[in-house]
Curated annotation (Swiss-Prot):
GO terms for cellular component: extracellular region. It is found in: Secreted. Its main location: secreted. This is Carcinustatin-16. Keywords: Amidation, Neuropeptide, Secreted. Belongs to the allatostatin family. The modification Leucine amide is found at L8. The keyword Phosphoprotein does not apply. Transmembrane segments: none annotated. May act as a neurotransmitter or neuromodulator. The lineage of its organism: Eukaryota, Metazoa, Ecdysozoa, Arthropoda, Crustacea. It comes from the Eukaryota. GO terms for biological process: neuropeptide signaling pathway.
């Protein structure tokens, strides 16, 4: 969900 790969 953001600029990196989190669980978002």
């Amino acid at each position: 969900g953001g600029p990196y790969s989190y669980g978002l």
